[in-house]
């Protein structure tokens, strides 16, 4: 593991730049303080100095009230949340950063080796029960335990066969966030905490092994032992010191807490020092020098877990209004002692629709329960308003064809709620920009420029005082919310960053990022990597059109890469994503009541194996048909045989085409209307 260096002094934020947590319930209304007008000069305001960092450190361990589920986490500003911290110290308890795992025959024992505690965590290998013990069990020749180092406990996954304890076996430091080290999970291990004694239990355990393997391969997981990555700077700033004294898991935004369900057993046992909040998304830092001024940019992607899933098995929104592939992207800029951030979101079109794979390259779109579309969409936008303020929804799909039907449904459903605070803009990306003229996105910017200026961004001065806040966000979508969406979001982020740097005097009045080639190149790579990470988690491949984001233009290599990635997406969507979807749903607890022997066992060969058999039969029939045609030159009877083989080949092909969905890798815990 490479060393993680602290953020340099010039890049560290001011005290107070921290956020508010939110749950599914409505937050308490709060009147925003008056926002002073922007500075008219291109010089920063007087009184600039290096920001002062006040890292939070715990003097003693704090025990939290157990919670039965992640949805019960306290709401920021909620009386329960404030009362819970009335007697708390002004900083959260420290989390264990390094543990020695002892694997005894009857239990796992986690020994902290970071000097934070003398007690060990003991987890039963029979039933998963947890307790704190003062010493290791006695060791002998017959009980020689296996020992390894782990870097945290993700949580406990409860399956029908028994519980599994998920631990971090490897990590990689990827940078720092507000002066605190941030790590990416590079190794996960599921430790069985049950005994499969009967043949039936062993069979069930083997059937779950594929899902556990998929869970261990989860990508894009990030965490920090000292600060909560689930919260935006603006929300965190509004919390207050009492709320910040809560353990990190209680500060977390449940929508973005990837391991919220897994943490429940640890919460019930009040194991605060082991409760490590994890997000799925992306985290990056870049550092640049512009006109002798240091500029530091941080990009964070937070994937919502409410309707988490894969590209073709999670589309649209659920009846509660939670959209698929909903990702919050926060761009943070630090320069001259100032800290600024801008948040924008992406998410699938928020009504009920699906696109079930059926071996075709582009499966058909089906809008479900049309009569409920307006209600579901209203719920979604009402939730966005509570969390982000005003919303401008940018729809990038085609205006004609299959995508056009979705656009028409979206436009018709959102029309009743359009107002000054909810705007809708349709921008046919492919028609206007084509495959190479992405500079025409300036036409879209012209339509939202006034909105961006009106709703501003979050800005702190060098003393940690809030100069202004972001009062609205941009919600962008295409069909997948990946390729076209990332190109558009990078344009919005670029325009916001330029206005911030101009305001602080780092840029001149007419300066743009493209005027500084080194900075421009780094910034393009930042957004390209951001889009690739989100795309890989949802579709299994990097984003298409990534060469424009990365280099500012379309390239031959980029077009070839898009072709390869498109083919890879086809394979993964049809033959791999069903199992991946099951693993995601199990980790999030979405089907906790359904994980039983009845549905866990498909009892039939996998889709890929069935397709291979059909494909082999088609190839075999085609080969014998060719052989018979050659022999028909000498004996016409072979022509009849060739026609028989041709008929078999065509028959199998037509059967596979008609029943394509049966040959695809489908989730076992998901039943569509078909």
Residue locations for each model-derived region?
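Generic low-polarity alpha-helical segments
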Residues: 3, 8, 39-40, 165, ...
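Low-complexity proline/serine/threonine-rich segments in eukaryotic and viral proteins
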Residues: 1-81
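Enrichment for repetitive, rod-forming helical segments
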Residues: 9, 27, 31, 37-38, ...
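A phosphate-binding catalytic loop at a beta-strand-loop-alpha-helix junction
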Residues: 472-492
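Residue-level marker of positions within ordered structural domains that often coincide
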Residues: 20, 47, 61, 398, ...
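Phosphoinositide system proteins, centered on phosphoinositide phosphatases
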Residues: 73-467, 496-674
